[in-house]
Amino acid sequence: MTSTLIPKETSTPGGRDLRDARADYFFKLLLTAAVAFVLIALVSAALSMLWGGRQALQLQGVSFFYSTEWNPVENKYGALTPIYGTIVTALIAMLIAVPVSFGIAFFLTEVAPRWLRRPVGTAIELLAGIPSIIYGMWGLFVLVPVMTDYITPFLNDHIGTLPLIGTLFQGPPLGIGTLSAGFVLAIMVIPFISSIMREVFLTVPTQLKESAYALGSTKWEVSWNIVLPYTRSAVIGGMFLGLGRALGETMAVAFVIGNSVRLSPSLLTPGTTIAALIANDFGEATESYRSALLLLGFVLFIVTFAVLVIARLMLLRLSRKEGN
């Protein structure tokens, strides 16, 4: 009696390679689609704002970007005042937030006891999750009265009389203004910058810091001569990330800046930013006014994009220097 053996089906190496190649192809296709989706969304957002602002651009021409006159009744639009307010408030925020963030990060990594590092770090990170409107309400009901009663009179009396910089600190004690908006923005971006600084400070090799301490260096000398040079690229990247956040903030700034489209060198007078002006006026804008606001949105897009490009170029330059 003879028996026939039925060969067992097995997957050949060639078939397995074919399935792997197909899976890899579809995976690459999925990743490409994700990247294409982001790029298309980015370009379409910019082009839609530019297309929506074509009427204002045709009406005003290039003067839209450098004129200070903003009169919707007469269809006269100049973007220089909100552009100035956007840049100045962001710079004030960075001047305050960067040194404070550095101090927080160095305290949590080098000075604070271990039992205190985690709760303090968590509390600071939670600040990043607070809605911006909460910051705006805090600024309006807490910061503005303090500015009105204490800070603005002090600045007027002691700094407003100085040559050159005195003009920046002269104004009525209203409390609302560019300086108040800068303070609120600083509080908002501190969690982002300090979290990045803390994480990169933890990457500094312990041997480097211990060697500096063994040679008699103080904590300040270690932070300035060891920690910062080692983490310079990442720190600069975190600073520009915070700057980009400050440039586009809307609601918190709208609460405390005063929303006045008048160019003034004083930081104590009401002003406006691009985002705040769009948020306040877009809902009730006429067709021509809406076109001007859309063109302002395109300007804000370009400013933010330029900041990120500059940050990227600086990081590339630093990495090349470090590589050499």
Curated annotation (Swiss-Prot):
<keyword id="KW-1133">Transmembrane helix</keyword>
<keyword id="KW-1003">Cell membrane</keyword>
<dbReference type="Pfam" id="PF00528">
    <property type="entry name" value="BPD_transp_1"/>
</dbReference>
<keyword id="KW-0812">Transmembrane</keyword>
<dbReference type="InterPro" id="IPR035906">
    <property type="entry name" value="MetI-like_sf"/>
</dbReference>
<dbReference type="InterPro" id="IPR000515">
    <property type="entry name" value="MetI-like"/>
</dbReference>
<dbReference type="GO" id="GO:0005886">
    <property type="term" value="C:plasma membrane"/>
</dbReference>
<dbReference type="InterPro" id="IPR051124">
    <property type="entry name" value="Phosphate_Transport_Permease"/>
</dbReference>
<feature type="transmembrane region" description="Helical">
    <location>
        <begin position="173"/>
        <end position="193"/>
    </location>
</feature>
<keyword id="KW-0592">Phosphate transport</keyword>
<dbReference type="GO" id="GO:0006817">
    <property type="term" value="P:phosphate ion transport"/>
</dbReference>
<comment type="similarity">
    <text>Belongs to the binding-protein-dependent transport system permease family. CysTW subfamily.</text>
</comment>
<keyword id="KW-0813">Transport</keyword>
<feature type="transmembrane region" description="Helical">
    <location>
        <begin position="87"/>
        <end position="107"/>
    </location>
</feature>
<feature type="transmembrane region" description="Helical">
    <location>
        <begin position="29"/>
        <end position="49"/>
    </location>
</feature>
<feature type="transmembrane region" description="Helical">
    <location>
        <begin position="291"/>
        <end position="311"/>
    </location>
</feature>
<keyword id="KW-0997">Cell inner membrane</keyword>
<feature type="transmembrane region" description="Helical">
    <location>
        <begin position="235"/>
        <end position="255"/>
    </location>
</feature>
<feature type="transmembrane region" description="Helical">
    <location>
        <begin position="126"/>
        <end position="146"/>
    </location>
</feature>
<dbReference type="GO" id="GO:0005315">
    <property type="term" value="F:phosphate transmembrane transporter activity"/>
</dbReference>
<keyword id="KW-0472">Membrane</keyword>
<dbReference type="InterPro" id="IPR011864">
    <property type="entry name" value="Phosphate_PstC"/>
</dbReference>
<comment type="function">
    <text>Part of a binding-protein-dependent transport system for phosphate; probably responsible for the translocation of the substrate across the membrane.</text>
</comment>
<protein>
    <recommendedName>
        <fullName>Phosphate transport system permease protein PstC</fullName>
    </recommendedName>
</protein>
<feature type="domain" description="ABC transmembrane type-1">
    <location>
        <begin position="83"/>
        <end position="311"/>
    </location>
</feature>
